[in-house]
Amino acid sequence: GKGAHLFTRTYANGLALLAILTAYPDEATAKAKIISGGPFNGWSYYELIVEALDLIKWYQGDGDKRGSWFYGITQTASRYDGSTQQWPTMVIKAAEDRWGIVSPQWVIDNAVHAMQNRLSSPGGGIGYSSGSSSVDVGKTGGGLVTYSLAKMPLNDPVMANALSYAGANWFSATPRKEGGPGWVSNLYAMFAIKKGLDLADVETVTTSEGERDWQRDLSSWLLGRAENLPASFGSSKRSPAYSFGQNADGTWEDTWVFIARGGKNIRAAVGVGIMARGLTDFPPKPII
């Protein structure tokens, strides 16, 4: 097909496509639901995702930009960018897990090449334009998404190195805005590492404080539950201004990507996404 997109920017397009993929549990349901109105009038949601995946494949970089994705989605990627890589691979992984749509192996191989050979630091963390540029836990979560898409086992040296980096920097209270690798006050980083650890199917990370339930730590920060966190961790940032606890209207503040993009509604959605158990597959709900 000619491809389709919901937004022209990689972040927003990925979030919107993930919402569709998680709204319908399987291929049959997605094929049965027909869009009424707008540019995709008469299409099924399944057709829309297939076309969106075609575009994702098309704008992946080639040659010396092999496997890259950049901010805009209507032209081939012009450089490597560790912050954008995770959104296309997240959609590809969700399409496979939810609806059984398997993308060509070359797309996945190229994505791994970008993360492993162009963006990874020796310590396993993922950087911005290279493995020595703005390496942090958030972008490393994006690396874990890509490695999980490629079905790397946990004992693969590449996967193990990335997990080790995440654990070693788990309790850094210095986020990217302040030049550090941590996730505190950074909803983008929190959602990114949540995606990566969830898809890697690990329940704990090995940190300076021992084994930690990463989901509990992230959720505790967002809910303002100080009793669940080490006393010294981010002690100067324990206020709603740093995403520690919700605002009165149930939303969160942010200090990075979502401070100026999307408004409070997207911050609320991302906050809930961070705390939700699962990303492409969700635990069964008990019947009470």
Predicted regions and their residues:
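An alpha-helical repeat/solenoid feature that recognizes helix-turn-helix modules
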Residues: 1-54, 58-109, 116-283
